Amino acid sequence: MDLAVGPGAAGPSNVPAFLTKLWTLVSDPDTDALICWSPSGNSFHVFDQGQFAKEVLPKYFKHNNMASFVRQLNMYGFRKVVHIEQGGLVKPERDDTEFQHPCFLRGQEQLLENIKRKVTSVSTLKSEDIKIRQDSVTRLLTDVQLMKGKQECMDSKLLAMKHENEALWREVASLRQKHAQQQKVVNKLIQFLISLVQSNRILGVKRKIPLMLSDSNSAHSVPKYGRQYSLEHVHGPGPYSAPSPAYSSSSLYSSDAVTSSGPIISDITELAPTSPLASPGRSIDERPLSSSTLVRVKQEPPSPPHSPRVLEASPGRPSSMDTPLSPTAFIDSILRESEPTPAASNTAPMDTTGAQAPALPTPSTPEKCLSVACLDKNELSDHLDAMDSNLDNLQTMLTSHGFSVDTSALLDLFSPSVTMPDMSLPDLDSSLASIQELLSPQEPPRPIEAENSNPDSGKQLVHYTAQPLFLLDPDAVDTGSSELPVLFELGESSYFSEGDDYTDDPTISLLTGTEPHKAKDPTVS
């Protein structure tokens, strides 16, 4: 017990308690069997560590763990001394462990103050470690700042690209809208060009002709291009007189005009069975009246941009106007060319004053006279509806389907080098043969005296829907087609004799292709 108290009383006060206890433990002679000084006094030996931990350590320390005792020695700078025999392969016979410290010497207790714990060295290592870590953290922060700057740059670029993408989408939408508008404009231009091409190929009328749906008591104004011309050969000598104001509307539709022979083309405004039309360029004194045969004309499909025309056929013998011809019977008679039609025969003549003339030889089959062709309202309305539906279908095709137009093809339409088969024009020979066949077998030829004996012959009106005249050169027309109007070939055929002079008649010059040179009539607007 004194040994335990002794160490607390001995030694200086600034020596650590572990060192004081260790000095007392080593210097105690009662424990020399387990712990004691070395013979030199520079170190101490610990024998039988197990027994030492069980019997000695609990007396001086709060534990009996040999490892903790060795760790405490290392903290104060004690080192384990290793001998040569302990480093061999043979285990030593005695368990002996020696520890030494330069300041822990036998008989020199005052040197215990120099023994310190290794706190300073540990703090130095920690500071160096902290400095190294600080450098690493600084480098990491620098790298993070660089990455942050690059990330901000990428964000700005992405934002700019997003704005540019939105601007591009808006521009694409605007361009699509403009493209749609331009496509509509192009479609309208194509329709306009097609209408121009059709108007250049077809002789147009300046204004629409009113429909003959009902009789009208008041006569309408005469069209600008309404004029009369004959389709048959004029017998007898005598040229046409010079054109006069007879082409005006007042003289053309006057009841006092002189009656002449030959088919007349004009506009029918009302039914006038007792008022025949006048021939524009002749008088009774200049030319005798001649008879003509009834003209059967096939009804061709009308051209959509123009109104139908009406042909007035004037046979040499006047006929009675008792039974008008219905359009259905007239069309059936046209289809049956070989069969006699009720409208092909002529009856007793009747002049404008109602006096009966001597009867002339007539065909064996009695036929009714050809009166004014009365248009059926239902048939005409059906025809107009069909035309409207065709125009609507064409407009739908042009507007709904996108297509491209070759400008060279449009320019070729105006070029004089274009061939007629490309334009699908009708056949001249077949059409001319058909009209001559219709003109010739109607009645046998009569002498000129019989024609002159009937000065006052009436006219019969024939409903005729003609194709509009094409403004083309007859010399350049290809006769291989099958649908061209027969009026082209009249100027080249032998229908007119070479001795007759028709240069003064504008209608004949229109058929022959020669334009008469005359001053413009001031009455024609």
From Swiss-Prot:
Covalent cross-link (Glycyl lysine isopeptide (Lys-Gly) (interchain with G-Cter in SUMO)), residues: 298
Glycyl lysine isopeptide (Lys-Gly) (interchain with G-Cter in SUMO2), cross-linked positions: 91, 126, 131, 208, 224, 298
Region of interest: Disordered: 272-327, 340-365, 441-460, 495-525
Post-translational modification: Phosphorylated. Phosphorylated in unstressed cells; this phosphorylation is constitutive and implicated in the repression of HSF1 transcriptional activity. Phosphorylated on Ser-121 by MAPKAPK2; this phosphorylation promotes interaction with HSP90 proteins and inhibits HSF1 homotrimerization, DNA-binding and transactivation activities. Phosphorylation on Ser-303 by GSK3B/GSK3-beat and on Ser-307 by MAPK3 within the regulatory domain is involved in the repression of HSF1 transcriptional activity and occurs in a RAF1-dependent manner. Sumoylated with SUMO1 and SUMO2 upon heat shock in a ERK2-dependent manner. Sumoylated by SUMO1 on Lys-298; sumoylation occurs upon heat shock and promotes its localization to nuclear stress bodies and DNA-binding activity. Phosphorylation on Ser-303 and Ser-307 is probably a prerequisite for sumoylation.
Gene3D superfamilies, per the entry: Winged helix-like DNA-binding domain superfamily/Winged helix DNA-binding domain
Subcellular localization: Nucleus; Cytoplasm; Nucleus, Nucleoplasm; Cytoplasm, Perinuclear region
Motif 9aaTAD location, chain numbering: 408-416
Xref: Pfam families: HSF_DNA-bind (PF00447), Vert_HS_TF (PF06546)
GO molecular function: chromatin binding; chromatin DNA binding; DNA binding; DNA-binding transcription activator activity, RNA polymerase II-specific; DNA-binding transcription repressor activity, RNA polymerase II-specific; general transcription initiation factor binding; heat shock protein binding; Hsp90 protein binding
Compositionally biased tracts (Polar residues): 343-355
InterPro entries on file: HSF_DNA-bd (IPR000232), Vert_HSTF_C (IPR010542), WH-like_DNA-bd_sf (IPR036388), WH_DNA-bd_sf (IPR036390)
Residue positions where N6-acetyllysine is found in the record: 80, 91, 118, 150, 188, 208, 298, 520
D domain: region residues: 203-224
Regulatory domain, as annotated region: 221-310
Skewed-composition ranges (Basic and acidic residues): 515-525
Region Hydrophobic repeat HR-A/B, residue ranges: 130-203
Residue ranges, annotated region (Hydrophobic repeat HR-C): 380-405
Positions bearing Phosphoserine: 121, 216, 230, 275, 292, 303, 307, 314, 319-320, 326, 345, 415, 440
Region named Transactivation domain: 367-525
Keywords: Acetylation, Activator, Centromere, Chromosome, Cytoplasm, Cytoskeleton, DNA damage, DNA repair, DNA-binding, Isopeptide bond, Kinetochore, mRNA processing, mRNA transport, Nucleus, Phosphoprotein, Stress response, Transcription, Transcription regulation, Transport, Ubl conjugation
Positions of the UniProt region annotated as DNA-binding domain: 15-120
Assembly mode: Monomer; cytoplasmic latent and transcriptionally inactive monomeric form in unstressed cells. Homotrimer; in response to stress, such as heat shock, homotrimerizes and translocates into the nucleus, binds to heat shock element (HSE) sequences in promoter of heat shock protein (HSP) genes and acquires transcriptional ability. Interacts (via monomeric form) with FKBP4; this interaction occurs in unstressed cells.
Similarity remark: Belongs to the HSF family.
Role summary: Functions as a stress-inducible and DNA-binding transcription factor that plays a central role in the transcriptional activation of the heat shock response (HSR), leading to the expression of a large class of molecular chaperones, heat shock proteins (HSPs), that protect cells from cellular insult damage. In unstressed cells, is present in a HSP90-containing multichaperone complex that maintains it in a non-DNA-binding inactivated monomeric form.
Protein name in UniProt: Heat shock factor protein 1
